[in-house]
């Protein structure tokens, strides 16, 4: 019974994060950001890696300052590194942690590009490309692959895709 109550509480946190994401996607960036900050204070720096990764990933998107966006994306990556498939499967059975990395590294590459740090951007776009094989051939996977390709071209990495 205690385990079921704990699972319900964890699911409640993911629901609350999802509600803040919906606010942001609906155009209310400031309200979403405020809710994310409140949730982050509940979760804490050492809280559940799934909660930290998910929240930080979406909180980064609400940032206007690229330095702040980078800080949140780095938090998301750090939390993903702590996340296990076992924990993730408690929330969503068909997802593996390795499937997070293409998007996480793509976001970091974009952050570094905005900050005019091309070597760091290239490093992360290469890591995104290396991890992209973990994604399904579906709308999400296709979108991430396309975004990686666009950023590779912007960073001058597009030639790495040509096979002779």
Question: What residue spans do the PLM features occupy?
Answer:
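TPR repeat positional signature
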Residues: 16, 52-56, 105, 124
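Alpha-helical adaptor scaffolds
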Residues: 54-98
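Conserved small/polar residues in nucleotide/adenosyl-binding loops
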Residues: 162-164
